[in-house]
Each structure stands twice: as structure tokens, then as C-alpha cells.
């Protein structure tokens, strides 16, 4: 498994991103009193959600288009389809040939990427600010009409299939725990299927299915456009209307039922990995619903348990007992606690020495976790967690040429119809009390709400051959 910070950039990422040659202002550390992100939000008649957040600190602009279709609700019997379609979006559009979108952005001094996540697929560019119109024209061009043919589909099926072989089937800890935990912890198919994709499903995708998928989900009324950086608001609005205004809305099907029943008993899964050099253990707890008081409390519990060398799990497992040298995990292993919109897990995983029993590792983890369920947390620990989360949150806003902030604004527009809630987050976390931490931990950190995966290496003489 990649460390969480690296996975965010690498998972489902296109390999052509070039180095970012400029910076964005950092929002990290302790922001000044009254810190405020400028947000203007409106919708076009065709339903496109538009978020504008000007910042003239650096002469760059970040443009992101988020479609409300991730791998969570991809078609049954077509696992991996959302990811496959992400690749198809770079195979040409009405006025741009195959891979010309990439060349256009890079030739204008920019970077670009696309990714598939639980609840959205996104595409973004960071460009010099005088190239804003270029980015908007290009994104609208492929929203208007995708150039899809049998040759492109077969080519990308091969590319995605190879990714599955390299990243999952033939890699140590290939799907552990970022694929394995959701599949084991959840019972609803939408949350529990193999989202990276089964090779058989990927190879079975038909051209007509790709066209239908595009016509259904890649529509303005199923998307959010966010622009962050150095731009004139009035001019940006004109560009948005000019290029996205004519795009026709589609009849988007309602979201399926994603709910999970309350888990009552602990689940334990045993897994063998012939390529793993060491055993590993992962735990995952079902999260509260988004935007509830308990949700914000879990954000702080994540800081207490997992984030940094002062985290409770690291101190107990690494510093005190010497069972591991690192603890990975967090809320939403493929993003963060803000950019998803369905059932989610707070997860942690460790790799440990073969001489140690898995039960002993789990007991050590419980030794760090259980005190949060037994009495109100120490005020000093809670305050430190609030500072850590605040610093991390504002640092993320300045990442990748404004991508971090753009990601939050687009997610809040897409899922909550309220991107301005970015300015209310700090207050929500500040309202969390020791009593709320205790209440939340009692319900959500109980063993009955937990799934445990025990991964053991296979003996070398019984290892299975890698898939070709």
C-alpha cells in the first residue's frame, strides 16, 4: 500500500503529470483571525454548478471539473468501468484529437490530471492565469462530445488491465487495505465491490456501454466546475457562459441506496499474500454520516490516533512496544474526510515482524484506542488535535497550484450544494468537546463496528506465480 499522502496523488492518476514550476500561497499554520476563502457560487440554466474563488497571489489558475460518478455507483458486472472511462476522456473530443488535450495544456505551460474516486471522477489543470479561457474551452469541448471508437476502447482496456496487474495482482500488499477493507466491511454492493476492477469485467466492456455512460453521467447537471487562482471574476463568468452554457443537460438517474446497516459484531478476515515480505494488520471502523457532530469528532479522533509521530497508535505500537516503524491510514484512504459522499471507514494499518502474533498487534492497537471510549479525552490532547487538523486543512488548500482548495470547493458544491461551507469547517471542529469525543468513540470505535484484516505472507515454496 502506498502511504496515504502518496496514494492521493498516485491512485488512478494519469502518468503524464509534469513537475509544477510555480507555487501557490500556503494557507498552513495558524491562519490569521478572520481567515476567509472568497467563494462565489451559482448555477447555469443547464444545471452546471460553478464555483469561483479568486486569489491574486500568484499568476496561476486551477480549473477542475468534477462529475458525480465514481466507482461506487458504476454498473454491476462492469467493475472498474468508472476508472476505464476516466482514461477514455483523453482519447479525443469534438475539436481535439487523441491525446491533444494533454499537449494543449502542456504546451501552454500547465499541468493536468484526472482521477476516479468513490463518489466522483475529476479532471483538472493548473495553467498560467492568462490561459484560463483555453482550459475552459477544452473542458467544455470534451463535455460536449467525446470521440469514442473501438480502437480507443480496446487500447484503454489494455492500459487499465495492465494497471490492475501491476498495482494489485503482482504487487506486494496489492489491494491491501484500500480495496480489501471496503469489500470486507461493507455489505451493500455499491460500497463493497472491487472498484479497481476485475480483469474479466474490464475486458468485457462494450463501445455502446461507454457511449451510454458518457451520455448519462458526463452532463452539466451532474457536474461542478471550480476555478481557483488569479482571474477576473467577470471575465471568468463570460468564459463559463460562452463555453459551458450551450452544453445540454441530461436525464441523470437518481442515486442508488448506499446505506449500510449498523454493524453489530466484529468481522475478521484472513488473507495470504505470496509477495508480501512481512505480515500486516488493518482495521476499519464505519464512519458517522457526513456533517454530523460525530463526523467532526471523528476527524479529530483521526488526528489523535493516526496523524503524526505524536499519534496514539504510533506511540503505542512503534515507540512503546517496537512492533512496527509506521502506522498508516485515516478517513478515506483515497482522499480525505471532505471529498466523499457515502459510507466510509476510518482505517489504520501496520506491517510488523513475522515473530509477532497478529493478536498481539491488535491488542496493542486496542490499548491506544480503548481509552478514548472509557473517559473524556484530556483537554490538552483535544486542543492539540484541533491545531493539527487546522494546520493540515489549510496546508492542503495550497497544494498543487491551488488544487487542494479547488478539490474542497468542487466536492462541497457537488455533494452539499454549498461550497462556502469551507469557511465554517474550523468552527465545526472547534465546537467538539471531550464529551462528544467520548460519545463518538463509544459508538464508532467499538469492536462490533470494526473489520480486521490479518494479512500473512505465504512461504516462498508455496507462492503462486504472478499473473501475466
Q: Where are each of the predicted segments found?
A:
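Bacterial N-terminal signal peptides
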Residues: 10-21
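Boundary at the C-terminal end of the N-terminal hydrophobic targeting segment
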Residues: 21-23, 28
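N- or domain-start disorder-to-order transition segments that initiate the globular core
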Residues: 32-58
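Non-catalytic, conformational "gating/processing" segments within enzyme and secreted inhibitor domains
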Residues: 150, 157, 166, 174, ...
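An aromatic/glycine/proline-enriched structural segment found at the starts
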Residues: 187, 220, 224-289, 447, ...
